[in-house]
């Protein structure tokens, strides 16, 4: 109830008390993990998710949740291993492909990122998939492909303003990965 009301700190205390009364119950551990993740305490959430995974190794949600906590901590190589595991566990798992694409991209593995974005674009792309594929194409030096993908991201997002908001959220990452800051206005105009 506390968790549903977004009172995560209080929920954590209640779950800890429950864990004392009935230790190592997977339901309690997963809820503790979720509350910590909601509070953006990814390190603690990760500990609980790993504990839950040890108890439920067949659970297909846990590799994604563990990978997400690792990615939030910028531990992209470890996160990639979790997402590859999920991709192995489930066939054509777009959720895993998106995570692999993004973690590959921010790790500078642009060709790998592009491979996964191409798989997504062939199935059920969102506007952000076109945007991220555009980023990968840009950093691979393929401006024509980047422009095409940014154009699709613009049309899929509904309007240019929405696209630019999404693009601007990634601006610092693009610069960090090697895009010249003075080229950003030109790149924004490609869409």
Predicted features by range, described:
Residues 122, 135-162, 188:
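TPR/TPR-like (Sel1-like) alpha-helical repeat modules
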